[in-house]
């Protein structure tokens, strides 16, 4: 949430900052601003409410802001309404310190009251202004360096933050600090970059540093110097990002979401190839030993949103194949109850960005309990990846659309691979069954591609039902887990009220909501549960519901029971979620397009939720 970009070099900063901010639009925002400095000249600050286009128009695409050092920001309102006044950057009373901030400062009112007593005035309703003026206060009080001032402020600020700050006395320099909020620093050819996320600077460099938690850095003269909380210099390793710049572009598609839907065969294949060697799974890179796998007493899966839905699939698959008890938790609830973790529990945290605040907090809670942790993440070097004991990296590449597609699909692959390996190592599966399932797993990319070839039927159905008032998704077992994701996809980008229910629960209250014309979508890929779910759908139809059924090739009898049928290739039922979800992703996309909505940037949502 929110986006930060910074630049120091020989080129004009403003166009680079605007370009970087445009790559962070998926994070969600309601206003934007730039602060640019040309040598010793005063900092120029320009802000605009609304889309980035308004800021670009104000600055003639950055041409009117001259200078080679600057910071930019897209704001998601937390403290104070969306407005030009509340937009970042913010500055001290005399303009000595200018900065931008991502996160939430929990004790901002306390800090603000202190600063008012010291003679400071406030023009905005934001917590960020308090942080910038606190840094200014300590800079003047101790007459030290910017690092000293930021250090004193960090000790007194409670909450999460990523800060990028410029000082009037230090032209051509940017200072950054972070606590529990993502930030990366890039370098190339004597120039330095700051960003909240990789896509913002991928066009300019793939050489990056990950600044550690509770650390600071100084960017100047094409180099980065790191400091710990004591102000001592420390070293950080330079990392090369393997993504290419083209991966963060639309590539001829109308929307990033449709591009990413079509990238799923490759993303799934890449994730599989990263862990399959000579016809067997090789999870040595993940880090769990066979002894540790054999000793697992139970698994806790912790995640948010679509990643939580992956956990719901994992629960069915892991318990059935590996015969390990699996519990799933919403990350935002995990640490607010007395979680009873057995000594040999394994906590699996799933997060595309590796920066999801609630998931990161849950990971830390698990580590404090002394249990083993494993992260399934897409971003190398992210906070969750760095702090987990073991990491399974998915190979989805950059995902720009707010509504996840390929990250979800690669996370499914990760849990399938873990389930197979756990089952084999724990003696719950023989070699023949293991080889058969592994071969089946490798057919998923081709089968996803086959589903995408028939997307026009989904488009027709979506257009016909784009004005639906309520939509209910139902299923049993893995199909219920897929229904959760299908419902989320529809509601988050089309704004249609949608819910998912275990099909057997309909009769316990929900069926009272079914009326003439209500759209009910049933997922029926589990052979043993097919008849039961079909019976539940018939109950809905008798009450006037309009039915869509999603099942496997060969189950053509469904056409006698539903108004519209969608088929996916047959596959072992443990892996059916990977195929069943594709038509539901397409449905959400096409309904949103038919309603004329912004598919990639739905209202009120952010791609990476980095505040609790």
Where are the language model's segments positioned?
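Glycine-rich oxoanion-binding loops at beta->alpha junctions
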Residues: 68, 72-85, 275-291, 314-350, ...
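Acidic/histidine-rich
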Residues: 157-191, 466-492, 529, 534
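Conserved short alpha-helical segments that host acidic/polar catalytic motifs at enzyme active sites
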Residues: 1-254, 266-273, 277-297, 336, ...
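Hydrophobic alpha-helical scaffolding
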Residues: 7-10, 121, 125, 139-143, ...
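Glycine-rich phosphate-binding loops that contact phosphosugars or nucleotide phosphates
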Residues: 294-436, 440-443, 523-569, 587, ...
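Generic C-terminus detector
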Residues: 231, 546, 559-561, 571-612
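Active-site phosphate/pyrophosphate-binding segments
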Residues: 264-268, 272-300, 390-519, 592-612
